[in-house]
Curated annotation (Swiss-Prot):
GO terms for cellular component: plasma membrane. It comes from Plasmodium yoelii yoelii. May protect the parasite against attack by the host immune system by immunomodulation. The keyword Aminoacyl-tRNA synthetase does not apply. InterPro entries: FG-GAP, Integrin_alpha_N, Tip. Residues 679-701 are cytoplasmic. Residues 30-657 are extracellular. This is T-cell immunomodulatory protein homolog. It holds the Pfam family C2_ITFG1.
Length: 701
């Protein structure tokens, strides 16, 4: 009996060893990467191939995603509230002088984007933003367009999604100007157009998106004004100084192009305002004009920073994100020398500046005593902190493009934005960059985020970016002209794919649009957390009081919600990260309608999860604990003025390896169970025989 028990123990150990090796093999599968991935026959857009000099990542071109759309990309959003990100595009017809808006939704059953609806607009669209304009939970469209004149006169038009899922034009400032119809409650404040791309944000705390814009003024060169959302798909204009929520009225002219943003700079989980401006003292450089969202004497105000921050020379479109994963919003600024001979495209000295935000970090351990305010406790993660952007930028802060003759794409007509995303979920945000060389060859590269070694300067984690993965086109005549590229989670699995948007000339020399998707075909061992905040619309109880229950609630596309999380790494060190949902709107930044945090290799929960809404309320944020990684969290901030009643919905998205591990575990456990059952039966039979033999030695009289 004892001998048989030893056999069982030995078999269990052998099977457990086998189980461990199988799981390890499954976990390590998919790490072999081919030297290149061919992408032939990009329809008319010809041949592309993806070259990767590093391990871990593998992208494969996919022609079955329905991306061969003859229209220019405008924005991303969930049009039909199915938790899938859709495409909203537009195209201008020069002959008819009419633009068409197209909506392509992602179909889970077909695994591709399919045509859904379209709408017409008289005029040339220059920017398209999708957001819930009338607070009904459905995704609407806000259009920036111009007439036939060559001047920078940008009008706005709104398209509301009706009950038939179609876009219906509701408001048009060009038509209002033609009809001489007032759009302001104040005399002489009817602003029908702007000379810049406006910033989209909720400025007056009613939960509705407004627009901060600028109007040319003969007496003082410009007037900053706001288009206030009236809640019915329309807007009313008012001068900046008449809104009485800005403590300081001395302002500078917003640059054109601009990369203004609504981001949390001082770490209080409440979004602030940032404008790129032309400073009167130095008109050759671009500055940051910063307005901090504060409560002053019980009243919410935007308080201007003491001085504007001077950006590096020849700066382009700025990116705001937590690039060094320390819980504060940093900047990445691409720069180059431009030439008027090519419509102010980049011709030399292309660089990427990393500018960290220096502020108090989170305490690394929960038992740390914060007596000298040297660190921030996790419970105070949404409290205000002093901040400062680094000013003395040594060569350590600068990344080069690695190749001579390689430049950022884009020009004055289409300023180049870099796309931001964590490609391998290691916790550090990487860049997707559209490039061109002097021969006309087009490149799209992923520049990986890495730490500068042996850096002790200001105790700041300085990052640099290096060429990590490259998508390259052929040198044939029909090579597409790439105008944008973006990270995109096509299958909503927490893995960032890449979509490249371009134009080409058809056989009849007609300019056409198309795009191609590169799907990441392997996984890393790192985890992620995806978070989305709605705009404050009621999702559950309040619809009981209405005659018709709304089935669309996820089309908010809110701009400015702030997310903060804390995680503990394998060494037991606690760190925080911050992310802003839809922080920019000018010049088609192509930001996703959610924040995707890379968590790295951790076996722990997300310790704390904070969300703050861009309101002027005293109660503007809430916190939840112990969030499961590889999850998608949808925050329902209803009501906006009482954060204690906010709710979250969580859906877990396990990786593909999870199912393989489960299957192997079940098989091995079944085998172990069968062996134990067989050996147990054998042992009982032997025991029964021994018992019968023992009884036969006794004679019953």
């Amino acid at each position: 009996m004892v001998k048989c028990g030893k056999y069982v123990l030995i078999l269990e150990l052998l099977l457990l060893t086998l189980l461990y090796n199988l799981i390890k093999r499954v976990s390590n599968s998919g790490e072999t990467v081919s030297s290149f991935v061919d992408g032939y026959n990009w329809n008319i857009m010809e041949r592309w191939k993806a070259i990767t000099p590093k391990e871990k990542l593998e992208y494969k071109v996919n022609y079955d995603l329905g991306l061969d759309i003859d229209a220019e990309i405008g924005d991303f959003g969930d049009y039909n509230s199915d938790v899938k990100t859709d495409l909203i595009l537009f195209k201008y017809d020069k002959t008819t002088m009419i633009s068409t808006i197209f909506v392509y939704i992602f179909s889970p059953s077909e695994n591709k984007f399919i045509y859904h609806t379209e709408a017409k607009l008289e005029g040339k669209i220059v920017n398209l933003m999708v957001i819930d304009l009338n607070f009904d939970g459905s995704l609407d469209a806000l259009v920036l367009f111009k007439d036939n004149s060559s001047q920078d006169k940008f009008y706005i038009s709104t398209f509301i999604q009706n009950e038939n899922d179609e876009l219906e034009e509701k408001f048009n400032t060009k038509k209002k100007e033609t009809e001489n119809e007032t759009i302001s409650d104040f005399e002489d404040q009817n602003f029908y157009f702007t000379n810049i791309h406006p910033l989209l944000c909720d400025i007056n705390n009613d939960g509705l998106p407004d627009l901060i814009a600028q109007h040319p003024n003969k007496s003082k060169s410009f007037s900053r004004f706001i288009w206030i959302n009236d809640g019915d798909g329309g807007f009313k204009s008012i001068l900046w100084e008449n809104l009485n929520i800005f403590e300081y009225t001395d302002i500078s002219e917003i640059s054109n192009p601009n990369s203004s943003a609504i981001v949390d700079l001082n770490g209080d989980c409440k979004a602030d305002l940032v404008f790129t401006v032309i400073n009167k003292k130095n008109t050759k450089r671009i500055f940051l004009e910063i307005w901090i969202n504060k409560i002053v004497d019980g009243k919410s105000l935007y308080v201007k920073a003491d001085e504007d921050y001077m950006l590096p020379a020849n700066s382009m479109q700025i990116l705001f994100a937590d690039f060094n994963a320390d819980g504060s919003i940093d900047m990445v600024v691409p720069t180059c020398v431009k030439s008027s001979s090519c419509n102010y495209c980049c011709t030399s000295d292309d660089k990427i500046y990393f500018i960290p935000n220096i502020q108090t970090k989170i305490c690394e351990n929960s038992w740390t005593k914060n007596e000298d305010n040297k660190c921030r406790l996790a419970s105070n993660l949404c409290s205000e902190s002093d901040f400062e952007f680094a000013k003395k930028l040594s060569p350590d802060y600068i990344s080069l493009l690695d190749d001579k003759g390689l430049h950022f794409s884009g020009d004055a007509s289409y300023p180049s934005y870099l796309s931001v995303g964590d490609v391998d979920d290691d916790g550090y945000l990487d860049l997707l960059v559209s490039l061109r060389n002097d021969k006309g060859q087009k490149f799209v590269r992923i520049y990986k985020n890495e730490q500068i070694s042996n850096n002790e300067q200001n105790h700041t984690d300085i990052r640099r970016f290096y060429n990590y993965y490259q998508f390259i086109s052929s040198l044939e005549e029909s090579t597409p002209d790439v105008y944008n590229a973006a990270f995109f989670d096509i299958f909503e699995n927490g893995i960032l794919d890449v979509i490249i948007f371009g134009t080409y000339n058809s056989n009849s020399k007609i300019k056409k649009y198309s795009s191609v998707g590169f799907v990441r075909s392997n996984e890393t061992d790192s985890l992620f957390l995806k978070s989305t905040a709605l705009n404050g619309i009621c999702v559950n109880d309040c619809y009981k009081e209405k005659d018709k229950i709304s089935t669309k609630t996820l089309g908010g596309n809110a701009h400015g919600p702030t997310f903060k999380i804390t995680v503990i790494d394998a060494n037991g060190t606690k760190s925080s990260k911050i992310g802003i949902q839809k922080s920019q709107s000018a010049h088609s930044p192509l930001q996703l309608p959610y924040v995707l945090f890379g968590l790295g290799r951790t076996s722990n929960y997300v310790e704390e999860f904070y969300v703050g809404m861009p309101t002027h309320e005293h109660s503007y944020y809430n916190m939840w604990v112990s969030i499961i990684p590889n999850s998608h969290i949808i925050v329902i901030p209803y009501p906006l003025d009482d954060s204690n009643k906010w709710q979250i919905q969580l859906s877990v998205n396990p990786s593909n390896k999870f199912y393989s591990i489960i299957y192997i575990t079940l098989i091995c456990l079944s085998v172990i169970g069968v062996l134990i059952f067989i050996l147990d039966r054998k042992e009982k039979i032997e025991d029964s025989k021994e018992e019968m033999g023992f009884k036969s030695h006794f004679v019953i009289g």
